[in-house]
Amino acid sequence: MRLSYAMTETDFPRQRTLPLQPFRKLAASLAVVLLAASPVHAQEALFDTKAKQALMLEDQTGTILYAKTPDTLIEPAALAKLMTMELVFHALKTGQIKIDTQYTVSENAWRTGGAPSGGSTMFAKLKSSISVGDLIQGVIVQSANDGCIILAEGIAGSEQKFAEMMNARAKEIGLKNSTFRNSTGLPDPEQKVSLTDLVTLARYIKHEYPEYYRTYAQESFTWNNIFQRNRNPLLKLDIGADGMGTGYTEQSGYGLVGSAEHNGRRYIAALSGLATDKERAEEAKKIFEWAYSAFEEVNIFAEGETIAEASVFGGVKSSVPLKEHER
């Protein structure tokens, strides 16, 4: 039976895995692979999307199920906030800051990202003090630009220095082609990311900071007596989604990074270049549902099964069995 994988020859001539570096690689045994679910599904696996760029990955094995120009550099828009949050989570994990650490709202944060800006905001009051925990909720749930800037200034002293930290940290965790210029994702001609890097980043956050990742599934947050719902459209769909974020710029269109679990397996996707927020939600749902149905896990070898014999020269025996390791 000939099996077909969900990617084009121009993108990936053969199935790839996306590594988790520098932390432990969560790859399954080579004896476990994801294959098209049936001969019929082998043809259906030739999926397409209206997105200009797209990437779908199965998390446990790191298998790329679908890719469409995922290394093209695009404007990240609010998806840059994933990198901002990684730095905040890292600072919490290493003890540099605490969840109840208080930061003061500067005039820059208020004017650039707060109520006067007209953008996504948690409506932080000028010169008020806000805890790191509340700022995290503001950024993740409300996509708050003021929350990002307050955190950046509090941790690094200025947003410019924080952006330098973002770039250094991005390299440390395995991002290859992305450049950050601010904590919010507000337009900057030099600020670019790839979907490959965004999925790598999302995957890293999910595995390294499970206690903070849960905030991405929070449905709403109220600050300054203003109630706002989570902006991630995937949370409203019945597909098992529990994160991550969205973004929009005129040049890159509507984009999204989403993470969802189905039948005990996690899938992470990124889309960009969509025409409307409605189309973004529709295409995101479509690619997740396709991934759930088009592939199945296949155990090629049983645990402890002899796969082959290896010749031994000068030993007691002429050969030794090669067996599938215990899982």
Task: Give residue ranges: language-model regions.
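Bacterial N-terminal signal peptides
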Residues: 27-37
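Juxtamembrane/membrane-water interface recognition
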Residues: 18-21, 36, 84, 151
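Domain-terminus/edge residues, biased toward the C-terminal soluble/receptor-binding domains
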Residues: 175-179, 187-327
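Active-site-adjacent loops and short helices of periplasmic peptidoglycan-processing enzymes
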Residues: 42-199, 203-208
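Hydrophobic alpha-helical membrane context
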Residues: 36-37, 75, 93, 295
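Bacterial N-terminal signal peptides that target proteins for export
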Residues: 5-28
